[in-house]
Each structure stands twice: as structure tokens, then as C-alpha cells.
Amino acid sequence: MAQETLETARFQAESTTGGMIRIVPLMFVLLWSSSFITAKVGLRHLSPLLFVAIRLVGCAVVLSVVMLVLRRSWRPLANGRWFHCAVAGALLNAVGLMAPHIALVTTPAAQIALVQSLTPLLTAACGVLLLNERLRAAQWLGLVLGLMGVGLVVGAAALESAARLQGLILAFVGVLGLVAGTLYFGRFCRDVPLLQGATVQFLSAAAVGSLGAALLETPHWEWTDGTIAAVLWNTLMVSLGGMALYSVMLVRGSVARASANFYLVPVTAALLAWGLLGERLSAHVIVGLVMASAGCWLVSAAASPVLGDEVSQ
């Protein structure tokens, strides 16, 4: 009887854990999409690189305190692993945030989110070349479709204004940071405990972000309730919560499968921007969003049977 009760409790625990794991991608999409909206609000009163620097320093401080309180060892970062985590953090959290935040000053959030949808497409393509992952025909179709969707919006932006085009180019630089950081993490950091790895990543990113704010802009700030709320949300919920969820997805699967969860981000961010910021969506942007999201979905839907089997085992 006692053994049956123990087995029942174990089954319930496993079911609960499995259910939590299944909703991780949805939670990530909602958090990541919201960051474009709250960043827009914060950038009304904060210069972009200062916004990013405060966000990254806040994350680094919180995680360092958690490390001290929990008395976690730094030993898992021995043998040069700390360096790999630092590189991944600089790419994912510094380059991946600094460029698109500058872009958000002049470019609608929906269009920035659309360019960010290139992340799973480029990650999947690079995974084939660098990590020996394999893609199915449907996923190659998804890559082409997504690129066409983003190209449609970028082409239209080039005709609208130079500032809009520059913003989208900066957003693409952020994508390159995310892709490089994702691949680097998948290659060198997957066996590092989450807390230790994340702490080093944010310490590195905070250093790069602070240096960028000091050298690349003239910082300005005006603290309002909206600004404070935006900084807190993007620091605690998006950077800490969102990147933790992303790391969980990376550890449990291939880099292509993890980053493919971005396919819902453009549409979700566009709807949030329309509802909360009053951003209007032109016909070509809507078409581009649909094409890019469909492309990312194709990459994601076909990932399970083929992608990551060799990497995750």
C-alpha cells in the first residue's frame, strides 16, 4: 500500500513537472513579446544603452546575491567554462539587446519583433553547418518563407525613410548576437548549472552594456512611474525569467528547436503594440508577419523527429 502511494505521488509529480515543461515555450513567448512594448515605454525617458545597462547590471546583482545566499560553488565554471559563459552572455544579453533597443527609438515595435523572428531561421541554418543538426525539406521551406517575409518589410522600410531602414538593420545586428550566443551556448555551455552560468553571463553582459552606454551615447534619464515599471519588468521578468526559460529549452533540446519558439513572438508583439501602444499595422507588415511566423512554425513543427537527437543525447 505504501509503495502504491509512493508510486502514485511520483507519477503525479512527474505529470506536474511535464506540464510545467510544456508551458515553458508559451511563457517565454509572452515574456519576450512584452519586452518590446515595455522597452518602448521606458525609452521615452531613458537613452537606449543606459536602459540596457541598468537592466543587465540589475540582473547581475540579483543573480550574484542569489549565488551568495544559496552558497553555490563556482567549481562548475572551472576549466575555462566561465570564459565560455562570459562570451555567450556578451553575445546573447549585450549585443542581443543593445542594437534593437537603439532601433526601437525610431522603429515600430512590431517591425523590430519581425526582424527578431529571423533568430530561429538563422540558428537552424547555422546549426546545420556548425553543430551537425539536420533539417527537413519543410524546414528549408520555412527558412525561405521567413526570409521573404522579413525582406518584404525591410524593402518597404527602405522606401519609407533612412531612419526606419537603419533601425531594422540594427535589429538584425541584435539577431546576429542572439544567433551567435545561442550557438555558442549550445556548443560550450550546456553542461553548466543554470544559476552559475547565468550569473557569469549577466556579469559579462553588464560590463559590455555599461561600457557601451559610457562610450556610444550621451546618457539621459527621467525617472517616472512608467520608466521604473519598464526597467523592473524587463529586468526581473524578461531578462531573468525569460532567459532562464530559454536556457531550460536549450538544455532540453537542440538549438533550432529552442529558438523556433520565436515563431509566435512577431505576431504576439504586434498585437500587444497595436493594443497598448496604438501602433498601426500596414498591409505589407501584416503580410510579412504572417510569412515570417509561418516560416518559423515550419522550422518548429518539423523539429521534433529529426533535430537535436544527436545533440541532446
Regions found by a protein language model. Name each.
Residues V52-I54, N93, L97, A110-L118, ...:
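Helix-helix packing/entry segments at the starts of transmembrane helices
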Residues S47-C59, I102-T119, R164-L176, G226-L236:
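Structural signature of hydrophobic alpha-helical transmembrane segments
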Residues L30-V61, T106-Q111, A180-A205, T218, ...:
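Juxtamembrane helix-loop-helix junctions in multi-pass membrane proteins
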Residues S33, I37, S64, G89-A94, ...:
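Hydrophobic/small/kink-forming positions within alpha-helical transmembrane segments
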Residues I23, M27, A53-G58, F83, ...:
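Hydrophobic residues within alpha-helical transmembrane segments
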Residues M1-M27, V61-A88, H101, V105-T106, ...:
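Membrane-interface interhelical linkers
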Residues L6, L63, C126, L135-A157, ...:
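Hydrophobic transmembrane alpha-helices of multi-pass small-molecule transport proteins
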Residues S35, G58-V62, V115-L129, V144, ...:
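Alpha-helical transmembrane segments of compact multi-pass small-molecule transporters, enriched
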